[in-house]
Curated annotation (Swiss-Prot):
GO terms for molecular function: 4-hydroxy-tetrahydrodipicolinate reductase; NAD binding; NADP binding; oxidoreductase activity, acting on CH or CH2 groups, NAD or NADP as acceptor. This is 4-hydroxy-tetrahydrodipicolinate reductase. PROSITE patterns: DAPB (PS01298). Disulfide bonds: none annotated. Catalyzes the conversion of 4-hydroxy-tetrahydrodipicolinate (HTPA) to tetrahydrodipicolinate. The lineage of its organism: Bacteria, Pseudomonadati, Pseudomonadota, Gammaproteobacteria, Enterobacterales. GO terms for cellular component: cytosol.
Length: 273
């Protein structure tokens, strides 16, 4: 890719996040909407993507076959579901198109496929594209190094009723940031459910609690609790535009990288702090 205007494709264009992404593209300099894709059979196929997102006519018609639109974009932004994202990944890898992936819920095989594809194309893969959340992840690393060994750590997350995976990708990223800072593996210390007689809390574990209700955009709290005091680090999102803007900024940043696997900490240069 060059430093000229970057053409963006958005899959799931008719969804809540897809419409926000279209709005973000139209509001940001250096990018244009090149393609918009919906699932086959969707009544939205054939409509104008701009009118769909409420930003006026863009003369970009919603299609249903990504493989037929690869000449129209440089970077694909994907906030769909794992099985669909992996199909899109294969197409992008074949045609050397970069990707911004905000899909969550991948298993280990899916994550490995993304890592392998990054040998050929540039990919920004993050559980959360909010600037605030990624600053929180950095704060959690610092807190875990100071307090992690002697406090009880709990992560509580809340999302809208339509979210299909739990815990959220952001909650897991918070757990991984804490565990990594303490030299542990999250899979060895995570506790995802408690029910019935559980006995006392085991030292060194990281607990997770999930809420699904109403239209909550996203709330995450990491708690470091000791006897007599506790520290809570919280992020609350009130609009999906914060995620959409971060994803589009990632696409612009990715224009300077032909290949490699990155996350928002790379985009925001947080790894230097």
């Amino acid at each position: 890719m060059t430093d000229s205007t970057i053409r963006i494709a958005i899959v799931g264009a008719g969804g809540r996040m897809g419409r926000q992404l279209i709005q973000a593209v139209t509001q940001m300099e250096g990018v244009v909407l090149g393609a918009a894709i919906e699932r086959k059979g969707s009544t939205l196929v054939g409509s104008d993507a701009g009118e769909l997102a409420g930003v006026g006519l863009l003369n970009v018609i919603v299609g249903d076959d990504l493989s037929q639109l690869t000449d129209n974009f440089d970077v694909l932004i994907d906030f769909t579901r794992p099985e669909g994202t992996l199909e899109h990944l294969a197409i992008c890898r074949q045609h050397r198109k970069a990707m911004v992936i905000g899909t969550t819920g991948f298993d280990e095989a899916g994550k490995a496929a993304i890592s392998e594809a990054a040998a050929d194309i540039g990919i920004v893969f993050a559980a959360n594209f909010s600037v605030g959340v990624n600053v929180v992840l950095k704060l959690l690393e610092k807190a875990a190094k100071v307090m992690g060994d002697y406090t009880d750590i709990e992560i509580i997350e809340a999302h809208h009723r339509h979210k299909v995976d739990a815990p959220s990708g952001t909650a897991l990223a918070m757990g991984e940031a804490i565990a990594d800072a303490m030299g542990r593996s999250l899979k060895d210390c995570a506790v995802y459910s408690r029910e019935g007689y559980t006995g006392e809390r085991k030292p060194g574990t990281i607990g997770f609690a999930t809420v699904r209700a109403g239209d909550i955009v996203g709330e995450h709290t990491a708690m470091f609790a000791d006897i007599g005091e506790r520290v809570e680090i919280t992020h609350k999102a009130t609009s999906r535009m914060t995620f959409a803007n971060g994803a589009v900024k990632s696409a612009i940043w990715l224009g300077k990288h032909d290949n490699g696997l990155f996350d928002m900490r790379d985009v925001l240069n947080l790894n230097e702090l």
